[in-house]
Amino acid sequence: MKLLLLLVVLGTVSARVQDLSGKMFTFPKQTNTAHVKLNPTKLDYNAVTVCHRSVTDIKRDHAIFSLATPSQNNGFLTFWQNGNQEIQPHIRNARVEYGGWDYKLNTWHSICTTWDSEKGLVQIWVDGMPSIRRYISSGAISGAVKIVLGQEQDTFGGGFDINQSFVGMITDVHMWDYTLSSCEIQNYMGEMNLTPGNVLNWRALDFETIGSVLIEDKPVCHPASICVG
C-alpha cells in the first residue's frame, strides 16, 4: 500500500473542516497524549448512531470512540475489552458486553453502534453482522460534549490512560442523531451509497489533532453490493 504522508503532528493543530474521503488517522505509537478531537454540530441527543472503521495489532483493552459530558465520562463509548474478548458499548455511564466477535488483529473492522433514549436499547454491528438489541440506558445525552479518537476519557476531555490508548488506524467516522436503518448500516459496511452523518461527517469533518497523529491515504477496499429498500 502506497501511503501519502500528509501531516505529522508534534503539537496541537488548530481546528478546521476537511474532507477526509480516502484518508485515515494513523496512531503510530502507544501514548497517553495523542488523540483526535472531533467537534460535533449539536449538544443534546435523544438517539445516536456512530460508525467507524479501524485496524490494530494491540492485544489489550482499547477505546475506539469516546464521547464524554461533564457529568458522564462514558457518555457514548466504543471499547474493546481484551480479557473477555468483548466489544463494550458504554452509554450514559452504563455498559453492555457483547462477546463472540471475530475481532482479528491486523484486520480492518467496521463497527456501528445504535441507541435511542426512549427505549434505552443499544445494538452493535460488526463487519455486517448485527448483535441482539439490549437495554442499556434511557434518557438523553445532554449538555456539552467532547469527542475523542485514540484515547478513552476518564474525565471530561482528559484523564487518558496509556493502557487504554488506541494504536493503529481509524477512518470513515460518522455520527447521526438518529438510529440508522439496518439497510443504511449495511451500505456503510459495504462502503456504498450512504447519507453522511449529520453530527460528524467524515467528508466534512471538524477536528483537531493532538500529539503524534498522521493523516494518510487509506487502503483501497473492495465494495460489497448496495443494500436497497
Where are these regions (language model features)?
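Extracellular glycan-associated modules
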Residues: 1-229
